[in-house]
Design a protein with these regions (language model features):
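Hydrophobic h-region of N-terminal signal peptides that target proteins for export
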Residues: 10-20
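ER/secretory pathway lumenal C-terminal domains and tails of membrane proteins involved
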Residues: 18-401, 405-407, 415, 419-422, ...
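Bacterial N-terminal signal peptides that target proteins for export
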Residues: 1-8
């Protein structure tokens, strides 16, 4: 029985952590409430002879209640290594995912300024209506929203799902129990169907590349497909990314009465079905059920104004369409050091993790606009999408010049627009701020080769 003895054990073990955490700042009331709720849920789920709870779990909850974020992070690593990843006796879902929620959030607090953690949450809560379904992609997008919601279990203010774990049958079991039919979710049959849909498509793309080697490759970057003894084998992260995307699609279809929102995890070109239905909404996207052709003028205008306000607040800059590329690069140089006459938030400038988070959010928007450039139905729509894509690329870069995703996204945009000279200027400036980054060195070499080719074929 996991009842009073367990609680006494937890208190005893917790005292060991509490002694070390005595000087730690106590969590804010809403954070303390979240930690207590998750701890109580583990206790209630296991008190009547359920799965055993390792003592490190109670230690972790106690450390979290004391605001000892470093100890929480260390204990989560121990729990993951000893009782979850590759362990013979893995933690039960009702324990593991609650441990992960608390440990993941506390880890973010330990490495990010809490002010900006709250800013992200506030911006998401502003745009997602009550009762909606929200797919968190990155660790911040998942753990922050889970922790700062009024109640994850009751879907208050909305229902949060981890998009990157939908393919995991253990996670699906957990959220089925968690939401108790409030949200309709895929069953194992639907997961199997998504897997079969992906493998059939992967086989078709692989066979195309084998039969037509001179045509553009259809196999995705990072998708390792091989034929072994007549059987197709696929390795890498891509299958999981694509299948998770198909399960997001299924959840949207299963819940026609609920609005859906998504925070991008990986860049999503492999979720081709989703792009036409994504609409910028604050720092994330609304996922509509029908494609938007084209994006509403009001949506584009609101997105531009939103990020102009936010970049002014965070980095003290407003980028305009007519801002010269050299000026953007010079501003990035200033924002990477001690900026003169800085008009933004100095705390933001000093927090590289937070800068990367907001840069990634804006870069995701640039990806949507770039995708629409090549699919525009008119020259005026194309010009508008080019304009919005470049603005978003520049803002993402200035928010965090050392974010390789923002650098790569802007370079790919410039190359797609046949602006090789600008791409060369940009990567030269970016490398000055990140001289040891091998990916950026590779980009510089590639763009130099493109430039040489253009000169030789004029």
């Amino acid at each position: 029985m996991n009842s009073l003895p367990t609680m006494i054990l937890a208190a005893t073990l917790g005292a060991l952590v509490g002694a070390r955490a005595a000087e730690a700042a106590q969590p804010d009331a809403d954070i303390a409430r979240f930690i207590t709720a998750k701890s109580n849920q583990v206790y209630l789920a296991t008190r009547d002879g359920g799965a055993p709870v390792p003592p490190e779990v109670w230690k972790m909850f106690t450390a979290a209640s004391s605001g000892d974020w470093k100890s929480v992070t260390n204990l989560l690593q121990d729990i993951t290594a000893n009782d979850h990843s590759g362990a013979m006796h893995r933690l039960a879902p009702e324990i593991w995912f609650r441990v992960q929620d608390v440990g993941g959030f506390c880890g973010l607090i330990s490495s990010n300024n809490l002010k900006f953690i709250r800013l992200f949450a506030e911006e998401v809560f502003k745009v997602v209506p009550p009762g909606s379904i929200y797919f968190g992609g990155s660790d911040p997008g998942r753990f922050i929203i889970t922790a700062l919601s009024r109640s994850q279990e009751e879907g208050q203010p909305f229902f949060t799902l981890a998009q990157s774990q939908l393919v995991d049958s253990v996670y699906l079991t957990y959220i089925h129990r968690l939401y108790r039919q409030q949200v309709k979710l895929p069953d194992q049959t639907m997961v199997n169907e998504a897997y079969q849909e992906y493998t059939a498509d992967a086989r078709q793309r692989f066979e195309h590349d084998q039969q037509f080697p001179d045509e553009p490759k259809q196999v995705f970057s990072g998708e390792d497909i091989r034929m072994v003894n007549g059987q197709m084998q696929i390795t890498g992260q891509v299958p999981f990314i694509v299948i998770n995307g198909l399960l997001v699609r299924d959840i949207v279809r299963l819940n026609p009465e609920r609005e859906c929102y998504i925070e991008e995890n990986f860049p999503l070109p492999k979720w081709e079905w989703m792009y036409p239905s994504l609409e910028p909404a604050g720092p994330i996207f609304k996922l509509r059920r029908t494609p938007l052709e084209p994006l509403y003028e009001e949506t584009v205008r609101n997105d531009r104004e939103y990020w102009q306000r936010l970049t002014r607040r965070l980095i003290g800059l407003v980028v305009h369409d007519e801002t010269d590329l050299a000026e953007v690069c010079a501003s990035a140089q200033e924002l990477s050091g001690k900026s003169k006459d800085f008009q933004g938030d100095p705390d933001f400038l000093q927090d590289e993790n937070v800068r990367r988070t907001f840069s990634r959010l804006r870069s995701a928007g640039a990806g949507i606009y770039t995708w629409r450039v090549s699919r525009a139905k008119s020259s005026s729509e194309r010009r508008q999408m080019v304009r919005e894509a470049e603005l978003a690329c520049r803002q993402a870069y200035l928010l965090c010049p050392k974010n390789p995703e923002a650098v790569a996204r802007y370079l790919m945009f410039l190359i797609s627009e046949h602006r090789i000279e600008d791409a060369q200027k940009f990567i030269t400036a970016a490398l000055k701020l990140n001289p040891d980054d091998q990916t950026e060195k590779d980009w510089a070499r590639y763009i130099r080769q493109m430039s040489d080719w253009e000169k030789n074929h004029r």
